[in-house]
C-alpha cells in the first residue's frame, strides 16, 4: 500500500541559529575549514553519525542541544564570523569580476555524468567525478560564471564491504534527497520545474534539483518520479548501472534533458564543456535548437 501522506518532524532552530540552514545548503562548507568547524563544534557525535551531512545532522539533533548552542556565546561568534566570510565570498568581486567585469548570467556550462563534491552527496565513483567537483569549486573561487549540469542518482554508486566469510560484496544505499544539501527548482507559482525527453518510445519526465556550490549552481535531473514508468524511473537509479541500453538512456537524458533544463531555467550559456563523452547528445540537441531558431533546412 502506498502512503497517503509523508511528513518529516525536525527540531525548531532557535532564531540565533537560523543561519545554519543557509550554511548547510551551500556546499562552500565542504572546502572551508572554518565552516566545517561550525558543524563539528555544534555536535561532534552528530556530525559523525550523519556521515558529515549538515542537513541531516540539523534535523536529527535534540532540541536541548540546539538551545545549548544558542546560549553559547563562543559558538555564536564562530557562526557569525563564518557567515560573514560566506557573505563576502558570494558577493565581493573575485578574479573574473576584476579581470572581465560583472557577473551576468552563467556564460559557461559544465556537463558531467558525475560530480564528486562531498561524501554526503554520493553521486560519483572516482576520478571523473572528483575532477568535475573540483572544477566547480575552482570556478566558484575564481568567480567564473559557470553552471553545472548532471544527473541525480537515487542509489548513486555501489559501496564495497566484506561479508563474514571475507568475500567482497556490494550495496547501494538509498539517497534521501530531502535530507541532503539539495533543493528542488521551482516555478514562480511553486510548482516543480520539470523537463521532458523522448527516450525509447516513451516521454520521460525529470524534475530539476539544485545544489549550490559556493557561487556556482549545479542542476541535477531526477527521473525517479511517479509520473514515469518503472523503467523510466530507473534511468537515474544508479551511476553507471545497468546494461549498454541503460547507459545510453542516461546519456540521452543528460545531453538532451540537460540542455532543455538550462533553457527552461532561463540560462543560455555561450560555451558548453562536456566532461568526456557521457553528455555527447548535448551537441545534437544544440544543433536541433539552432536549426529551429534560425529556420535552417
Language-model regions, residue ranges each:
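Catalytic cores of carbohydrate-active enzymes across secretory and cytosolic contexts
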Residues: 1-297
Amino acid at each position: 500500500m502506498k502512503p497517503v501522506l509523508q511528513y518529516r518532524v525536525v527540531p525548531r532552530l532557535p532564531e540565533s541559529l537560523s543561519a545554519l540552514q543557509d550554511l548547510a545548503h551551500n556546499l562552500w562548507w565542504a572546502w572551508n575549514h572554518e565552516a566545517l568547524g561550525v558543524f563539528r563544534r555544534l555536535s561532534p557525535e552528530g556530525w559523525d553519525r550523519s556521515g558529515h551531512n549538515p542537513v541531516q545532522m540539523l534535523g536529527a539533533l535534540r532540541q536541548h542541544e540546539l538551545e545549548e548552542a544558542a546560549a553559547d556565546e563562543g559558538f555564536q561568534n564562530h557562526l557569525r564570523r563564518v557567515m560573514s566570510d560566506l557573505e563576502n565570498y558570494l558577493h565581493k568581486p573575485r578574479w573574473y569580476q576584476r579581470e572581465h567585469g560583472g557577473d551576468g548570467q552563467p556564460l559557461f556550462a559544465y556537463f558531467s555524468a558525475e560530480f564528486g563534491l562531498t561524501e554526503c552527496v554520493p553521486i560519483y565513483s572516482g576520478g571523473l567525478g572528483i575532477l568535475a567537483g573540483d572544477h566547480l569549486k575552482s570556478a566558484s573561487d575564481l568567480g567564473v560564471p559557470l553552471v553545472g549540469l548532471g544527473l541525480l542518482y537515487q542509489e548513486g554508486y555501489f559501496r564495497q564491504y566484506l561479508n563474514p566469510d571475507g568475500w567482497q560484496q556490494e550495496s547501494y544505499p538509498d539517497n534521501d534527497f530531502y535530507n541532503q544539501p539539495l533543493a528542488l527548482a521551482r516555478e514562480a507559482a511553486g510548482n516543480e520545474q520539470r523537463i521532458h525527453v523522448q527516450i525509447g518510445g516513451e516521454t520521460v519526465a525529470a524534475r530539476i534539483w539544485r545544489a549550490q556550490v559556493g557561487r556556482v549552481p549545479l542542476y541535477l535531473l531526477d527521473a525517479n518520479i511517479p509520473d514515469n514508468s518503472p523503467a523510466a524511473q530507473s534511468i537515474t537509479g544508479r551511476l553507471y548501472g545497468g546494461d549498454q541500453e541503460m547507459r545510453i538512456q542516461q546519456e540521452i537524458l543528460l545531453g538532451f534533458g540537460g540542455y532543455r533544463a538550462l533553457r527552461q531555467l532561463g540560462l543560455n550559456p555561450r560555451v558548453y564543456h562536456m566532461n568526456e563523452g557521457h553528455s555527447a547528445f548535448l551537441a545534437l540537441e544544440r544543433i536541433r535548437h539552432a536549426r529551429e531558431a534560425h529556420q535552417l533546412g
